[in-house]
Amino acid sequence: MKANELRALDDAQLREKLAEYKVELFNLRFQKATGKLTNTARPRLVKKEIARILTILRERELAQAELG
């Protein structure tokens, strides 16, 4: 997903996506260890998605701290 699409989601949905991506990354690591990973670029993409989500959550957290 693009960052703009992620920003349209609320915090609960972002945390849900984050959990999904973490599970996917965990499974991809196992596939790599067993030699069954076919798309070797996928783990890198999943890590970037996780970073995007964490960045957006942190931005919102800091914005709330400034306001209140």
UniProtKB/Swiss-Prot annotation:
GO terms for biological process: translation. The keyword Ribonucleoprotein applies. GO terms for cellular component: cytosolic large ribosomal subunit. Keywords: Ribonucleoprotein, Ribosomal protein. CDD domains: Ribosomal_L29_HIP (cd00427). SUPFAM superfamilies: Ribosomal protein L29 (L29p) (SSF46561). The keyword Ribonucleoprotein applies. One of its GO terms (molecular function) is structural constituent of ribosome. InterPro entries: Ribosomal_protein_uL29, Ribosomal_uL29, Ribosomal_uL29_sf. Gene3D superfamilies: 1.10.287.310. Belongs to the universal ribosomal protein uL29 family. This is Large ribosomal subunit protein uL29.
